[in-house]
Amino acid sequence: MSKTNKKISSDINHTTKYGSKTPKKVYLSNKVIKRNKNDIRNISYKEINDEFSWGNYLNLKVIIMNDNGYINVTKLIQQANKEKKMGDWNKNKDSKNIVKSACEYTGLTEDKLFIIKTGGNNSTIRGTYAHPIIVAQIAGWASSDFAIKASVIINDYIAKQMFKEHEKIIEEKDKTIKRRDKKIDQLNNKMDDLLKKNDKMSKRIKRLVDTADDLRNQNDDINDKLDVVCNDRVVQSDTNTHRFVIMKNNSDKEDYEYHSIRRLKNSVNNAVKEYKELYPDAEIIMNLGYTPNSICLWNNIKKKLKSKRKIKGTGSDFNLRGDFTEEKLIEEVTKIHNSRFER
């Protein structure tokens, strides 16, 4: 091998622009050559001698140099189109542009893209050998059939590359979606936990409210018992200091609809005012301007009306039952109130 050929072979094997570089050594053993899968020399199928081999270049029988993969384009053109010659390609303006681009791409000078072999006594190997990167351009110029075959392969390669790119994009999107789905699941789980905690808290609050209501009612009952020991009948007096009022809530709240107020004369107005702060639409449906003992009166009312299943409630709050109307309530309370006076 000449020094020039060795230098070109070294440049090809170390370039990173053309095909894939072949840093591994090429071993010849029983004519089986192991190389990088992208090495153009893989098209070789039979050795001519130590320097050259026959190769199959898209069904074109070509001669390829063993050390650098250069292909005899003179013989390739003769085989593809007997009317064309290598000299014709060299004169072509497009060809010169291709050579220029190949030099820029490979980093080789123009004189290193081509090797001329005289062949000596062996005319088989005689001709111009071209760098593999421009062989397809020359073959396509010489043969329209080859150009179409090469176009199909190029399009197939581009399509496969783009398909791989699309798969990568889809894969990345799928990963992003999975990450987001996982995040959404985590947020949903947190939301579920918060809803459960809120539900538990709501139940606790309701229990506390119920307990507070019970305590308030118990307190009212205790106050009733502590404030007075009442009899069924009392003596009417001109100095009545107690007042008894029944309020109607007129509210959509899930509370009792009616409320009784038992207060001293000088505090009943404040009690009504405070109640209206809780229930702005509340109204007085009954106001006994005089009663000897409003606490005792209310105990008697509850006792008699509950026993007749006319009202239900706890403490000072109550609802009417069945067909027991507001008018009947006022009538019954008036009767109970009047029945307490001695005649």
Curated annotation (Swiss-Prot):
Pfam families: DUF3627, KilA-N. Residues 51-157 form the KilA-N domain. Residues 159-279 form a coiled coil. Keywords: Coiled coil. InterPro entries: DUF3627, KilA/APSES_HTH, KilA_N. This is Putative KilA-N domain-containing protein R904.
